């Protein structure tokens, strides 16, 4: 898609904000979150994603930081939910796929992978994907058993727009 065509829609003051929000949900956010289900996300990553999202939404609405509009009001005006919630949804959706696979599937073997003789360097331990998933599941009060029923799992992890 050509960016010039897209920016014409996003910058046009005649285009309603809800339509701009739909364009954001369909085109911009998927590009922003590509592969996010596999990232062991740190708080700094999440913060950067939120900042990038809000800059785009403010720009679409014709606002600047000087206008001092609250993030919630901008999101409500455009009709989108936080990128943080969508990242969590993507991670948990992938986790559900992984858990429903057979134990002999390659993705399950990688999940159980243990490296013998591997030493970590000094400093704070790296954050693992599994730790991020556990934190997400605690926040939404989910258990691993829930992944087996796909329909229930999808409704529980869904972040509404």
Regions found by a protein language model. Give the residues of each.
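Short linear motifs embedded in intrinsically disordered, charge-biased segments
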Residues: 1-161
């Amino acid at each position: 898609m050509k960016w010039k065509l897209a920016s014409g829609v996003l910058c046009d003051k005649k285009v309603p904000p809800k339509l701009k929000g739909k364009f954001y949900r369909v085109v911009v956010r998927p590009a922003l979150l590509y592969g996010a289900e596999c990232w062991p996300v740190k708080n700094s990553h999440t913060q950067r994603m939120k900042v990038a999202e809000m800059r785009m939404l403010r720009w679409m609405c014709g606002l600047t930081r000087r206008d001092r509009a609250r993030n919630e009001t901008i999101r409500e005006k455009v009709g989108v939910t936080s990128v943080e919630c969508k990242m969590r949804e993507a991670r948990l959706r992938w986790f559900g796929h992984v858990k429903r696979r057979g134990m002999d599937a390659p993705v399950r073997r990688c999940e159980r992978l243990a490296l013998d003789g591997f030493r970590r360097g000094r400093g704070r331990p790296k954050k693992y994907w599994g730790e991020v998933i556990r934190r997400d599941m605690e926040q939404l009060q989910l258990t691993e058993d829930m992944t087996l029923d796909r329909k229930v799992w999808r409704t529980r992890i869904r972040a509404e727009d």
